[in-house]
Amino acid sequence: MTQAFWQTKTLDEMSDDEWESLCDGCGQCCLHKLMDDDTDEIYFTNVACNQLNIKTCQCSNYEDRFRYEPDCIKLTRYNLPTFEWLPMTCAYRLLAEGKPLADWHPLIAGNKAKMHQGNISVRYIAVPEVEVEDWEDHILNRPKGRG
């Protein structure tokens, strides 16, 4: 049986298509975060970027997202270590830490159903940015410290 590319290649060795396919499409990167100016602590909210289709958990303008959302992140092999706030379930984070992908990951499960059923995606918690007046009212958890 042939091993999957993520089991045989490092993140640096992956093609652009392989890299992109690692994203499970959970939408967690597309939720806004708040940073405390005094402590640099990061607070996660359930406020979704305007470009996120909450039902599908996909960007509605992925190819042109930076034109619509200049603060959108572009995760690359080079800046991956700087995104310490990535969820513990993130494939990029898991592989960078030498861990396997989760059973529900679409590359293993074959679709996104298990991810949504397991509440990994933001489908059932995200609210559209345009409907939110005060992001601080939508903080999900305790802060995630930087570094």
UniProtKB/Swiss-Prot annotation:
It holds the Pfam family CxxCxxCC. InterPro entries: Puta_zinc/iron-chelating_dom, UCP006173. Belongs to the UPF0260 family. This is UPF0260 protein PMI1174. It comes from Proteus mirabilis (strain HI4320).
